[in-house]
Amino acid sequence: MKYETKVLTTKYQKPDAYGALSMPVYLTAAFEFPDAKAMSDAFCGRSMAPSYARIANPTVTYLEERVRQITGAASVTALNTGMAAIAYALTAVSGAGLNIVASKHLFGNSVSLIRDTLGSFGVEPRFVDFTKPEEVEAQIDDKTAALFFEIITNPQLFVADIKKLSEIAHSKGLPLIADTTIVPFPAFHAGDFGVDIEVVSSTKYISGGGTGLGGLLIDYGRFDWSQSPSPALQSRTKKVGKKLAFTARVKTELVTNLGSLMTPQVAYMETLGLDTLAIRFRRQAGSALWLAQQCQALPEIKRVNYTGLEDNPFYELSKAQFGSLPGAVFTIDLESKEAAWAFIDKLQIIRRATNLFDRKSLAIHPASTIFGLFTPEQCAEMSVPGTTVRLSIGLEAREDLLEDIKQAVK
């Protein structure tokens, strides 16, 4: 079944009492029970009834179930940001004395999360180039908790061989955790490439309008967590089984104790976003490819970076994994940082904003914003030069966007 049909025919196990075609927004902090036993059953996990809105909400559960059916996952947890999804995933698998082997080409806050936040909890960060599988494998030891990377890095747009990474991870008894935000699940099926845990900033493509923050934590339910060096996960396997330990820890410990469940308002907006996701993705990614091709002819632009371009070093690998439309983001390099800033300042249609995959096209200077707290030397190590401008392409007419780019580079 095609995505466009599948997404519109997924059915929730508990339909609305009034037969509403759209799931209602349950704006409530608490839920009433018919008797003391029903209340106890909900709080102790003997029933699926929501106990308190910090832990579960019917509107949020509806979004989780729809994504689970669409992706074929075992479970989905909807959180209030993409960073929360990453933080929960890495916290769930790690612990003091363990290490995480992560890509050195990550989003700036992901780097800080692993290096600073998890590092302060006693987790050792090991950053390496994930486009070089042999270097990844060399960093693994018996204290490694997981491998973590972005399927296409932001903003470098590097592409790793996902199946090769999966083979390495599984040969060592490790889970492969992937941030798939830049290419959504209508175009890329992470489970088919051996990804065990998928994290998505649903703020981006799924929301589509830049109206709400959200993150999805998707567990494909295939990894044997009894192999994990984490005592917390080993303990969970004895209670819920080898394949459910991760989700059990996320839902019954991390969500309950730390909060961060997605709000029902955002969950409602994202269920609507799912319905049109495939259509919007094809339009936006198609425009990105066309614009990247046109920008190659502009002499003021020194380099155009998009993995869908045939002269891109990652073109063949990108096409094999993501097809001919690997997302709606590309970057351009100008003569200098000053030229990059001047270009951004002159834009008239493309907005100056930090989000990705909004319906509106957006531009940002990564080195001075999302990587602005890193030193120039650190930015260079992460391949984020000051000459780069990142463009996220929206739904505007591509011809108008090209004219905007042309006038801004002059």
Task: Please report, for each region that a protein language model flagged, where it lies by residue.
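Conserved C-terminal alpha-helix-loop-beta "cap" of PLP-dependent enzymes
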Residues: 289, 295, 300-389, 393
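Conserved PLP-enzyme active-site core in the AAT-like
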Residues: 7-13, 75-297
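Short conserved active-site loop signatures built around small residues
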Residues: 1-26, 217
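Glycine-rich beta-alpha junction loops
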Residues: 12-14, 27-33, 204, 221-222, ...
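Short Gly/aromatic-enriched secondary-structure transition segments
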Residues: 40-46, 347, 405-408
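Short amphipathic alpha-helical segments
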Residues: 48, 74, 213, 266-270, ...
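PLP-dependent enzyme catalytic core of the Aspartate aminotransferase-like
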Residues: 1, 97, 115-116, 121-124, ...
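Conserved N-terminal alpha-helix of the aminotransferase class I/II PLP-enzyme fold
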Residues: 30, 35-87, 109-117
